[in-house]
C-alpha cells in the first residue's frame, strides 16, 4: 500500500506495520511515533498505531493538489486525488501557488494537518485534516478567505474505496463511510 511505502521512506526503517505492532524491533530500540509529518517531502501520516488493522490517513500535498488515502481495519476507505472546484461570484477560480503546510499538531488524542493554498484574486483556502484516534473519526474541512463579501460555490470529490458507500446526513455536512458488502 502507498502509505506503507511512505512510512518506510519517511522513517528510514524497514520495520513497519505488523513488524512494529508485534514488537519485533531490536531490543532497546524505541518504536517510532505512529503519526508523522515531513514538510520537505510534503507528506503526512495520521495514524492510530502500527498494526495492519490500525487506521491510517496518508496525505500527499506535492504540487497544486492533494492526494489522500484513508485505511481502517486493513480496508481502503478513500484513495486518490482530492478534486475541488471553486467559484466566487460565479467565476471559477484556480490555484496560483502550491499547497503549503501551515500547521502540524499531534498528541495522544488527535493528529491535525492544515494546508494553505492561494487562488486567483487573492483568495486563500485553508484545508484542515484532523484524525481523532480514540474516537476513530476523520474531519475534513476547507475554509475560504477573500477579503470581501462574495458568493462562494465549492465542491470536492474523493474517490471511495471498493464496496464503500457514502451516507451523507441530510441536514448537515456530516457523513459516514459504510462497508457496502
Language model: regions and residue ranges:
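Catalytic and substrate-binding regions of extracellular carbohydrate-active enzymes
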Residues: 2-180
Amino acid at each position: 500500500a502507498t502509505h506503507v511505502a511512505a512510512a518506510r521512506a519517511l522513517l528510514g526503517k524497514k520495520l513497519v506495520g505488523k513488524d512494529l505492532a508485534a514488537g519485533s524491533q531490536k531490543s532497546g530500540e524505541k518504536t517510532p511515533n505512529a503519526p508523522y509529518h515531513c514538510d520537505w517531502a510534503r507528506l503526512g501520516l495520521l495514524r492510530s498505531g502500527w498494526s495492519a488493522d490500525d487506521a491510517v490517513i496518508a496525505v500527499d500535498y506535492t504540487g497544486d493538489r492533494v492526494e489522500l488515502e484513508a485505511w481502517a481495519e486493513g480496508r481502503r476507505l478513500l484513495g486518490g486525488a482530492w478534486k475541488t472546484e471553486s467559484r466566487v461570484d460565479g467565476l471559477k477560480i484556480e490555484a496560483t501557488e502550491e499547497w503549503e503546510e501551515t500547521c502540524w499538531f499531534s498528541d495522544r488524542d488527535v493528529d491535525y494537518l492544515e494546508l494553505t493554498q492561494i487562488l486567483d484574486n487573492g483568495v486563500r483556502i485553508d484545508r484542515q485534516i484532523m484524525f481523532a484516534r480514540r474516537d476513530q473519526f476523520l474531519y475534513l474541512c476547507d475554509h475560504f478567505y477573500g477579503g470581501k463579501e462574495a458568493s462562494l460555490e465549492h465542491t470536492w470529490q474523493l474517490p471511495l474505496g471498493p464496496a464503500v458507500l457514502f451516507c451523507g446526513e441530510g441536514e448537515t455536512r456530516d457523513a459516514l463511510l459504510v462497508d457496502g458488502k
